[in-house]
Amino acid sequence: MALNGKLRGRFNNFYIKELISMYTLSQTSLDKLKGVHPNLVNFMKELIKISPWNFKITAGVRTAEEQNKLYQQGRTVKGIKVTKVDGYKLKSNHQVKYDGLGYAVDIGVLVTEKVIEKVKENGKEVEKEIEKTVYKGSWKDFHYYQDIYNKAKNAGLLEKYGIEWGGNCWKSFKDAPHWQIKGADKVAFK
Protein backbone atom coordinates (compact mmCIF):
# COMPACT_ATOMS: atom_id res chain seq x y z
CA MET A 1 0.00 0.00 0.00
CA ALA A 2 1.48 3.33 -1.08
CA LEU A 3 1.30 6.32 1.25
CA ASN A 4 0.15 9.65 -0.16
CA GLY A 5 2.75 12.47 -0.10
CA LYS A 6 1.34 14.28 2.94
CA LEU A 7 1.07 11.12 5.04
CA ARG A 8 4.45 9.83 3.85
CA GLY A 9 6.08 13.14 4.86
CA ARG A 10 4.44 13.00 8.29
CA PHE A 11 5.51 9.38 8.73
CA ASN A 12 9.08 10.10 7.64
CA ASN A 13 9.33 13.13 9.95
CA PHE A 14 7.93 11.08 12.82
CA TYR A 15 10.31 8.20 12.13
CA ILE A 16 13.37 10.43 11.76
CA LYS A 17 12.55 12.34 14.96
CA GLU A 18 12.05 9.03 16.74
CA LEU A 19 15.57 7.96 15.80
CA ILE A 20 17.69 11.10 16.15
CA SER A 21 15.89 13.77 18.10
CA MET A 22 15.33 14.47 21.74
CA TYR A 23 13.67 17.74 22.66
CA THR A 24 14.10 19.68 25.90
CA LEU A 25 11.96 22.25 27.67
CA SER A 26 13.07 25.86 27.34
CA GLN A 27 13.73 27.98 30.43
CA THR A 28 10.47 29.85 29.69
CA SER A 29 8.59 26.54 29.78
CA LEU A 30 10.32 25.49 33.00
CA ASP A 31 9.37 28.84 34.56
CA LYS A 32 5.71 28.19 33.68
CA LEU A 33 5.89 24.93 35.64
CA LYS A 34 6.60 26.75 38.92
CA GLY A 35 3.85 25.98 41.43
CA VAL A 36 2.63 22.94 39.45
CA HIS A 37 2.25 19.53 41.14
CA PRO A 38 5.66 17.75 41.05
CA ASN A 39 4.21 14.64 39.36
CA LEU A 40 3.04 16.79 36.47
CA VAL A 41 6.36 18.66 36.29
CA ASN A 42 8.32 15.39 36.18
CA PHE A 43 5.89 13.98 33.61
CA MET A 44 6.44 16.99 31.32
CA LYS A 45 10.22 16.79 31.70
CA GLU A 46 10.17 13.11 30.75
CA LEU A 47 7.53 13.50 28.03
CA ILE A 48 9.46 16.16 26.09
CA LYS A 49 12.41 13.76 25.80
CA ILE A 50 10.35 11.09 24.02
CA SER A 51 7.78 13.28 22.27
CA PRO A 52 7.48 12.90 18.49
CA TRP A 53 6.85 16.69 18.35
CA ASN A 54 8.53 19.60 20.06
CA PHE A 55 6.31 21.55 22.44
CA LYS A 56 6.35 24.41 24.90
CA ILE A 57 4.46 24.91 28.14
CA THR A 58 1.86 27.60 27.49
CA ALA A 59 0.21 27.60 30.93
CA GLY A 60 0.79 26.23 34.40
CA VAL A 61 -0.76 27.86 37.46
CA ARG A 62 -3.43 30.49 36.70
CA THR A 63 -5.13 33.05 38.91
CA ALA A 64 -8.93 33.35 38.94
CA GLU A 65 -8.53 36.56 36.93
CA GLU A 66 -6.40 34.85 34.25
CA GLN A 67 -8.88 31.97 34.04
CA ASN A 68 -11.79 34.40 33.71
CA LYS A 69 -10.03 36.22 30.88
CA LEU A 70 -9.87 32.92 28.96
CA TYR A 71 -13.51 32.22 29.82
CA GLN A 72 -14.56 35.54 28.26
CA GLN A 73 -13.18 34.47 24.85
CA GLY A 74 -16.10 33.71 22.57
CA ARG A 75 -18.49 35.23 25.09
CA THR A 76 -17.82 38.91 25.78
CA VAL A 77 -14.53 39.03 23.83
CA LYS A 78 -14.08 38.10 20.18
CA GLY A 79 -12.68 34.62 19.59
CA ILE A 80 -13.62 30.99 20.05
CA LYS A 81 -14.60 29.48 23.39
CA VAL A 82 -11.60 27.76 24.95
CA THR A 83 -12.91 26.84 28.41
CA LYS A 84 -16.11 26.11 30.30
CA VAL A 85 -14.85 27.36 33.68
CA ASP A 86 -14.85 31.01 34.70
CA GLY A 87 -12.31 30.84 37.53
CA TYR A 88 -14.78 31.99 40.18
CA LYS A 89 -18.00 29.92 40.22
CA LEU A 90 -16.28 27.04 38.47
CA LYS A 91 -12.55 26.73 39.02
CA SER A 92 -9.88 25.33 36.71
CA ASN A 93 -7.37 22.69 37.71
CA HIS A 94 -4.77 25.29 36.71
CA GLN A 95 -5.81 27.21 39.83
CA VAL A 96 -4.14 26.52 43.18
CA LYS A 97 -5.54 23.59 45.18
CA TYR A 98 -5.59 23.16 48.99
CA ASP A 99 -1.88 22.21 48.97
CA GLY A 100 -0.81 25.36 47.10
CA LEU A 101 -0.20 23.56 43.81
CA GLY A 102 -1.72 23.73 40.34
CA TYR A 103 -2.87 20.39 38.95
CA ALA A 104 -2.92 21.18 35.20
CA VAL A 105 -0.61 22.25 32.38
CA ASP A 106 -1.27 23.30 28.79
CA ILE A 107 1.23 22.72 26.01
CA GLY A 108 1.65 24.11 22.51
CA VAL A 109 3.11 21.96 19.74
CA LEU A 110 5.96 23.54 17.76
CA VAL A 111 6.60 22.29 14.22
CA THR A 112 9.32 23.38 11.82
CA GLU A 113 7.85 24.00 8.36
CA LYS A 114 9.17 25.29 5.08
CA VAL A 115 7.45 28.52 4.06
CA ILE A 116 7.88 30.99 1.22
CA GLU A 117 8.67 34.52 2.38
CA LYS A 118 9.62 37.70 0.60
CA VAL A 119 13.12 38.85 1.54
CA LYS A 120 15.51 41.49 0.20
CA GLU A 121 18.63 40.28 -1.57
CA ASN A 122 20.97 42.72 -3.30
CA GLY A 123 18.33 45.43 -3.00
CA LYS A 124 15.64 43.31 -4.70
CA GLU A 125 12.63 41.64 -3.13
CA VAL A 126 12.66 37.91 -3.85
CA GLU A 127 10.70 34.91 -2.66
CA LYS A 128 12.75 32.45 -0.68
CA GLU A 129 11.94 29.16 1.00
CA ILE A 130 12.89 29.26 4.67
CA GLU A 131 12.32 27.01 7.67
CA LYS A 132 10.18 28.47 10.40
CA THR A 133 8.96 27.11 13.74
CA VAL A 134 5.17 27.33 13.82
CA TYR A 135 2.80 26.95 16.81
CA LYS A 136 0.12 24.32 16.18
CA GLY A 137 -2.89 25.05 18.34
CA SER A 138 -6.04 24.90 16.22
CA TRP A 139 -8.59 22.08 16.08
CA LYS A 140 -7.14 20.85 12.78
CA ASP A 141 -3.86 20.24 14.63
CA PHE A 142 -5.39 17.70 17.05
CA HIS A 143 -3.33 14.87 15.51
CA TYR A 144 -0.06 16.36 16.83
CA TYR A 145 -1.40 16.21 20.39
CA GLN A 146 -2.81 12.72 19.77
CA ASP A 147 0.67 11.59 18.69
CA ILE A 148 2.15 12.94 21.94
CA TYR A 149 -0.59 11.28 24.01
CA ASN A 150 -0.01 7.94 22.26
CA LYS A 151 3.72 8.16 22.96
CA ALA A 152 3.08 8.96 26.65
CA LYS A 153 0.60 6.10 26.94
CA ASN A 154 2.81 3.55 25.19
CA ALA A 155 5.81 4.56 27.33
CA GLY A 156 3.76 4.08 30.52
CA LEU A 157 4.20 7.72 31.61
CA LEU A 158 0.48 8.33 32.24
CA GLU A 159 0.34 5.53 34.79
CA LYS A 160 3.79 6.28 36.25
CA TYR A 161 2.85 9.87 37.12
CA GLY A 162 -0.96 9.58 37.42
CA ILE A 163 -1.74 11.90 34.48
CA GLU A 164 -4.74 12.25 32.18
CA TRP A 165 -5.02 14.06 28.84
CA GLY A 166 -7.66 16.67 28.04
CA GLY A 167 -8.08 15.20 24.55
CA ASN A 168 -9.93 12.20 25.92
CA CYS A 169 -10.79 12.68 29.61
CA TRP A 170 -14.10 14.52 29.05
CA LYS A 171 -16.97 13.37 26.85
CA SER A 172 -18.27 16.79 25.81
CA PHE A 173 -15.06 18.79 25.38
CA LYS A 174 -11.75 17.91 23.73
CA ASP A 175 -8.94 20.06 25.16
CA ALA A 176 -5.91 18.73 23.26
CA PRO A 177 -3.25 21.00 24.86
CA HIS A 178 -4.42 20.14 28.42
CA TRP A 179 -2.76 17.63 30.79
CA GLN A 180 -3.69 17.19 34.45
CA ILE A 181 -3.24 15.04 37.52
CA LYS A 182 -5.71 12.15 37.32
CA GLY A 183 -8.59 12.81 39.70
CA ALA A 184 -7.74 16.54 39.94
CA ASP A 185 -11.44 17.41 39.67
CA LYS A 186 -11.96 15.80 43.09
CA VAL A 187 -9.14 17.71 44.85
CA ALA A 188 -10.30 20.70 46.93
CA PHE A 189 -9.25 24.23 46.05
CA LYS A 190 -7.49 26.58 48.45
Label the model's feature ranges.
Residues K91-K190:
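Catalytic cores and adjacent binding grooves of peptidoglycan-active enzymes
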Residues F14-A59:
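Active-site acidic/histidine clusters and adjacent loop/turn architecture
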Residues M1-S21:
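N-terminal amphipathic/basic-hydrophobic helices that include classical n-h-c signal peptides
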Residues E46-K78:
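Extended, low-complexity, intrinsically disordered C-terminal regulatory tails
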Residues A59, K81, G167-C169:
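Short loop/turn and capping residues at structural boundaries
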Residues E65-G108:
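Short, surface-exposed glycine/acidic/tryptophan-bearing loops
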